[in-house]
């Protein structure tokens, strides 16, 4: 009888371990339900984009309003993307930026973008991936930023087709980094969002849902 009980216990333990391995581990940067976490910091490049936490379409989100301005919110975090390779978020824009053009400095403005910043001991060699809602760039295209080749722009959305609706994005940061830089990624040190219109002088509005970081199941 004791042997039978031990076998049953071992069976349930193995079942629990198996089930836990089938589910991804998750980190939520900020669920936004208590306002903006103090872990978010703002960096201004020209003026200030207005960021506020609101409830829109029955979901908590960060609203961004830019008027010829460029500032971003960044969230410092230290993790290995090999352990947590997936990043997901939802976003929505009111409209694209008509003069936006990812291939020129004059058009380097985006209704919405999400940055992933990678660790470097030399700050001038810091690399970043920018997931952008582009205007003209074909969806899925990778190009260097018009100001620095250390930042790669990836057009996960492009054009006005999906403007006005929530879009859920899911990216494998490890795969994107390898495709962008031809190497394995170092640790990630920050994730940021930015809506900017300083180069074009236009206006833009966007909404960002909570950002989640996931392991693979």
Segments (PLM) and residue ranges:
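Bacterial N-terminal signal peptides
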Residues: 7-19
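Extracellular carbohydrate-recognition regions
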Residues: 24-45
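Extracellular beta-strand elements of beta-rich domains used
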Residues: 32, 191, 211-213
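Short carbohydrate-recognition loop motifs
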Residues: 50-72
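Solvent-exposed strand-to-loop "edge" motifs in beta-rich extracellular domains
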Residues: 90-96, 119, 174
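Extracellular/luminal beta-rich ligand-recognition
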Residues: 107-151
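Extracellular beta-strand ligand-recognition surfaces/modules
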Residues: 109-114, 149-159, 163-205
């Amino acid at each position: 009888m004791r042997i039978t009980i031990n076998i049953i216990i071992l069976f349930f333990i193995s079942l629990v371990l198996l089930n836990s391995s089938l589910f991804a581990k998750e980190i939520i940067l900020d669920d936004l339900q208590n306002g903006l976490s103090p872990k978010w910091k703002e960096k201004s490049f020209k003026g200030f984009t207005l960021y506020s936490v609101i409830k829109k379409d029955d979901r908590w989100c960060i609203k961004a309003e830019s008027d010829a301005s460029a500032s971003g919110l960044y969230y410092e975090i230290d993790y290995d993307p090999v352990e947590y390779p997936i990043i997901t978020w939802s976003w929505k824009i009111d409209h694209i930026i008509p003069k936006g053009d990812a291939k020129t400095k004059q058009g380097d403005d985006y209704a919405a973008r999400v940055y992933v910043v990678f660790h470097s001991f030399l700050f001038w060699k810091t690399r970043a991936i920018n997931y952008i809602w582009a205007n003209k760039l074909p969806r899925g295209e990778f190009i260097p930023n018009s100001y620095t080749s250390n930042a790669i722009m990836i057009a996960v959305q492009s054009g006005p087709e999906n403007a006005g609706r929530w879009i859920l994005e899911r990216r494998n940061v490890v795969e994107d980094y390898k495709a962008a830089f031809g190497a394995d990624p170092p640790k990630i040190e920050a994730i940021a969002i930015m809506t900017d219109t300083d180069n074009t002088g236009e206006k833009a509005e966007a909404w960002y849902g909570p950002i989640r970081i996931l392991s693979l199941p």
